[in-house]
UniProtKB/Swiss-Prot annotation:
Omega-N-methylarginine modified-residue sites: 466, 481, 484, 498, 525, 550
Name of the top EC class for this enzyme: transferase
UniProt-listed GO biological process terms: associative learning; axonogenesis; central nervous system neuron differentiation; centrosome duplication; DNA damage response; establishment of cell polarity; G2/M transition of mitotic cell cycle; microtubule cytoskeleton organization involved in establishment of planar polarity
UniProt protein name: Serine/threonine-protein kinase BRSK1
Modified residues (Phosphothreonine): 189, 529, 535, 583
Binding residue positions for ATP: 40-48, 63
Residues of the UBA domain: 314-356
Length: 778
């Protein structure tokens, strides 16, 4: 994540912003009150754009996430990042202001800092003085100490994720890999960047996230003082071996007391590695206490009273949604029990921290918005009705627009057609703790989920028991959510027919959660702008006629705005059993594999053809088998006399790091029917076509493997491409002549994202630890 010059999540959105000259104001793109301007960062998964408030002129960084181009597991990590950022309030952690969304994009409104990345600063200045390095290091440790006090582990610390403000103070960004480490449990997901990841993470072992962060801090401190990395190699396999051994050269110019600190932090044995408390007591760390820096003052702790909730008290739905996004509170019954217990526990701490955040920074409707001509403008995530600390409901803070809609339904002034539809849609949107987690579909192949938690004190005390159509009920507590951006009266469309919603039978509840079909806030009273035809008055009591018209309006709106998409990109090579349970709750291993995968789906069958001339069939088959055997980590089987099945994958490492490429090779005669083979298996010369068909796996790696096989078939000499493929598999990169072997200079632009990442800058933001397809971990 970034707000200065860093990459962001999401695909490239369709924003056409000014080139050299500004457009008239009516052509500007807005996210809420923020006008989008120049692009601050551009990565493989999205954009970060500068946003300027249309009234106050406040600058923010808007991270744009394209939901349709990312897998469901990655989107769930974005939601977890949002929830974690709401837990952290520290001067050296990047702030999250708000979250907006429409059907296609998710917009994270972040604090804007103008100093760029610490990585670029280090490249520009070279190694830093011990005084300046200590300043940065103490700020990083201060922020980490705050995060660890709330059991939050970053797990991807590196100079690229450390931003600088205008006063050169640190802001830790990109909590996409962060996790809550509950109690004494250990983490399992291997993540991070290979140059900064600790040995236990690389080995695929269970690890303490706090100790892993300490290793990364040691590597960062070494880079600040030396201008190079302690572990560096062009070959990824060799790099990982160096990290596991933990042997590095300590330059003589590093102060002796700092050398002892570095050795204590970059320690292979996690039990011997220095903890945060030990680091903060180290002489070199304390040596800068006399250096004045107001930003080094510890952040005031957030003290919240943790009380036990009464058995009949209501739990805040926004807070529960955020806790669900954190991924470690999946046992609903246990969470319910812990929140209502008399003793203090971590569940109550997280609950009251999020509730305190919601009370202090309520997310309400935007009051002053610029004119918008967008078909599907971004809408702000707003809070559900507020609950007190004792579970009592508070009056909801409603904007004038919401009041106008609810009052219009009871005889007030009419609402403009377009605005009424927008606000009616918005009232049904997922809500969160000032932008915390919303209800993502838990499966990329299924309809959206119901609320993760639906605690009701009594069986008859829910919304349906109170009456969804009660005249006094103008707000919703926790409705069963439909698709993002969809209305409450529409059913989630199946993947095969997304544009034709199927409304339920009139009068029947829409979901199994027991939520009424329609709420008082979501009765459309007018058709969208530009829709031919008018809306007839609803039937008395909302009978069959009203339901039919609502269904028709939903259908028109879907065809006008586009239906939500629930079929995410497929994860890497899921089996039939995995396809039936693609949720992190039921398949954590699959969720881990999906994070390392390149999220490439095969929309069509990919084939590569090779025509061979004047060569007998037996010779072609022998050459193919020889090519198979010459490629490391490639296995094959014979299907028939003219067909082979091959698989190229890493061997010897944890299964989470393997990305197999499976393909089939077929030989056919291009001169009529296939000639009959002789007794010795050979046939006469002719023209043969060799077809390589990708079955599963990354397309780019498939092409590289086929190119290597083709080189063998087209020549009788050993081809350097075989070794090139092996080097690529091991993570090697070709350096241009004159490139310094060890430095922190930024790598040149690469057109092949599947090639191993530069050791200087770490892998791309989304690739994390696995930089190449099929790279083995010894």
């Amino acid at each position: 994540m970034s707000s200065g010059s860093k990459e962001g999540g999401g695909g490239s959105p369709a924003y056409h912003l000014p080139h050299p000259h500004p457009h008239p104001p009516q052509h500007a793109q807005y996210v809420g009150p923020y006008r989008l301007e120049k692009t601050l960062g551009k990565g493989q998964t999205g954009l970060v754009k500068l946003g300027v408030h249309c009234i106050t002129g406040q600058k923010v960084a808007v991270k744009i996430v394209n939901r349709e181009k990312l897998s469901e597991s990655v989107l769930m990590k974005v939601e977890r990042e949002i929830a974690i950022l709401k837990l952290i309030e520290h001067p050296h952690v990047l702030k999250l202001h708000d979250v907006y969304e429409n059907k296609k994009y998710l917009y994270l409104v972040l604090e804007h800092v103008s100093g760029g990345e610490l990585f670029d600063y280090l490249v520009k200045k070279g190694r830093l003085t011990p005084k300046e390095a200590r300043k940065f290091f103490r700020q990083i440790v201060s922020a980490l100490d705050f995060c660890h006090s709330y059991s939050i582990c970053h797990r991807d610390l590196k100079p690229e994720n450390l931003l600088l403000d205008e006063k050169n103070n640190i802001r830790i960004a990109d909590f996409g890999m962060a996790s809550l480490q509950v109690g004494d449990s250990l983490l399992e997901t291997s993540c991070g960047s290979p140059h900064y990841a600790c040995p236990e993470v690389i080995k695929g072992e269970k690890y303490d996230g706090r100790r892993a962060d300490m290793w990364s801090c040691g590597v960062i401190l070494f880079a600040l003082l030396v201008g190079a990395l302690p572990f560096d190699d062009d070959n990824l396999r060799q790099l990982l071996e160096k990290v596991k051994r933990g042997v590095f050269h300590m330059p003589h110019f590093i102060p002796p007391d700092c050398q002892s600190l570095l050795r204590g932090m970059i320690e292979v044995e996690p039990e011997k590695r220095l903890s945060l408390e030990q680091i903060q007591k180290h002489p070199w760390y304390l040596g800068g206490k006399h250096e004045p820096d107001p930003c080094l003052e510890p952040a005031p702790g957030r003290r919240v009273a943790m009380r036990s909730l009464p058995s009949n008290g209501e739990l805040d739905p926004d807070v529960l949604e955020s806790m669900a996004s954190l991924g470690c509170f999946r046992d609903r019954e246990r969470l319910h029990r812990e929140l209502r217990s008399e003793e203090e526990n971590q569940e109550k701490m997280i609950y009251y921290l999020l509730l305190d955040r919601k009370e202090r920074y309520p997310s309400c409707e935007d009051q002053d918005l610029p004119p918008r001509n967008d078909v599907d403008p971004p809408r702000k995530r707003v809070d559900s009705p507020m609950l007190s600390r004792h579970g009592k409901r508070r009056p909801e803070r409603k904007s004038m627009e919401v009041l106008s809609i609810t009052d219009a339904g009871s005889g007030g002034s009419p609402v403009p057609t377009r605005r009424a539809l927008e606000m009616a849609q918005h009232s049904q949107r997922s809500r969160s703790v000032s932008g915390a987690s919303t209800g993502l579909s838990s499966s990329p192949l299924s309809s959206p989920r119901s609320p993760v938690f639906s605690f009701s004190p009594e069986p008859g005390a829910g919304d349906e028991a109170r009456g969804g159509g009660s005249p006094t009920s103008k707000t919703q507590t926790l409705p069963s959510r439909g698709p993002r951006g969809g209305g409450a009266g529409e059913q989630p469309p199946p993947p095969s027919a997304r544009s034709t919603p199927l409304p339920g039978p009139p009068g029947s509840p829409r979901s199994s959660g027991g939520t009424p079909l329609h709420s008082p806030l979501h009765t459309p009273r007018a058709s969208p702008t530009g829709t031919p035809g008018t809306t007839p008055p609803p039937s008395p009591g909302g009978g069959v006629g009203g339901a039919a018209w609502r269904s028709r309006l939903n259908s028109i709106r879907n065809s006008f705005l586009g239906s939500p998409r629930f079929h995410r990109r497929k994860m890497q090579v899921p089996t039939a059993e995995e396809m039936s349970s693609l949720t992190p709750e039921s398949s954590p291993e699959l969720a881990k594999r999906s994070w390392f995968g390149n999220f490439i789906s095969l929309d069509k069958e990919e084939q590569i053809f090779l025509v061979l001339k004047d060569k007998p069939l037996s010779s072609i088959k022998a050459d193919i088998v020889h090519a198979f055997l010459s490629i490391p980590s490639l296995s094959h089987s014979v299907l028939s006399q003219t067909s082979f099945r091959a698989e190229y994958k890493a061997s010897g490492g944890p299964s989470v790091f393997q990305k197999p490429v499976r393909f089939q090779v077929d030989i056919s005669s291009s001169e009529g029917p296939e000639p009959s083979p002789r007794r010795d298996g050979s046939s006469g010369g002719g023209i043969y076509s060799v077809t390589f068909t990708l079955i599963s796996g990354p397309s780019r790696r498939f092409k590289r493997v086929v190119e290597t096989i083709q080189a063998q078939l087209l020549s009788t000499h050993d081809q350097p491409s075989v070794q090139a493929l092996a080097d690529e598999k091991n993570g090697a990169q070709t350096r241009p002549a004159g490139t310094p072997p060890r430095s922190l200079q930024p790598p040149p632009g690469r057109s092949d994202p599947d090639l191993s990442s530069s050791p200087r800058r770490g892998p791309p933001k989304d690739k994390k630890l696995l930089a190449t397809n099929g790279t083995p971990l010894p």
